[in-house]
Amino acid sequence: MRMHTRLQFLKRVSNVAYSHGQEQAKKEKVYKEMTQLKSQINRLCRPCPWDWTVFQGNCYFFSKFQQNWNDSVNACRKLDAQLVVIKSDDEQSFLQQTSKEKGYAWMGLSDLKHEGRWHWVDGSHLLFSFMKYWNKGEPNNEWEEDCAEFRGDGWNDAPCTIKKYWICKKSAMSCTEK
């Protein structure tokens, strides 16, 4: 009988070890599947919302309808963005080309606070190096034109009350694993 009890005991130990091994294999399988899912999610990650365009770490929204400059500023705020503030020549080139395809569009530049002193909606002033982007003879304030738009191959000042397309900008999200 003693031998029989010993065999039963060994059989139970063996079953426990086998069960433990199966549990470990299940855990490893779940971990592997989880790692694969994380990898797939990262590939699906979008740094910008749908209908936005990514360029050099920023997201740009090109409106599908027109409104005046102030309403455009507010529309961008509602999207947790701002009417586009241009920070580089590359960005200017990208926006100018894209806006040419879509139509005249507001940017976040105006001289509403003080005539002739152009400021971006983020409070920064227009750099001298960007003056080259004004179309010939612009800005001219011909008709109380205090807001800037993309027009043709450059910038134009226009009355802020005119309805135009508009471009919002915000930082792109990171898709890296944390």
Swiss-Prot record:
Entry keyword annotation includes Calcium: yes
Native organism taxonomy: Eukaryota, Metazoa, Chordata, Craniata, Vertebrata
MF annotations from Gene Ontology:
D-mannose binding; metal ion binding
| Species of provenance | Mus musculus (Mouse)
All residue ranges annotated as the C-type lectin domain in the record: 54-169
- Specify the glycosylation sites in chain numbering: 70
* Top-level taxon: Eukaryota
Task: Report the record's disulfide bonds.
Answer: 48-59, 76-168, 147-160
Instruction: Quote the protein name from its UniProt record.
Output: CD209 antigen-like protein C
Record-linked Pfam families: Lectin_C (PF00059)
Alphabetical list of CDD domains matching this protein:
CLECT_DC-SIGN_like (cd03590)
Residues that coordinate or bind Ca(2+): 138, 140, 145, 156-157
- Please give the InterPro entries that the UniProt record associates with this protein: C-type_lectin-like, C-type_lectin-like/link_sf, C-type_lectin/snaclec_domain, C-type_lectin_CS, CD209-like_CTLD, CTDL_fold
Ordered alphabetically, the record's keywords are: Calcium, Disulfide bond, Glycoprotein, Lectin, Mannose-binding, Metal-binding, Receptor
- Claim: Nucleotide-binding is one of the keywords in the record: no
Q: Which residues cross the membrane?
A: none
Role of this protein: Probable pathogen-recognition receptor. May recognize in a calcium-dependent manner high mannose N-linked oligosaccharides in a variety of pathogen antigens.
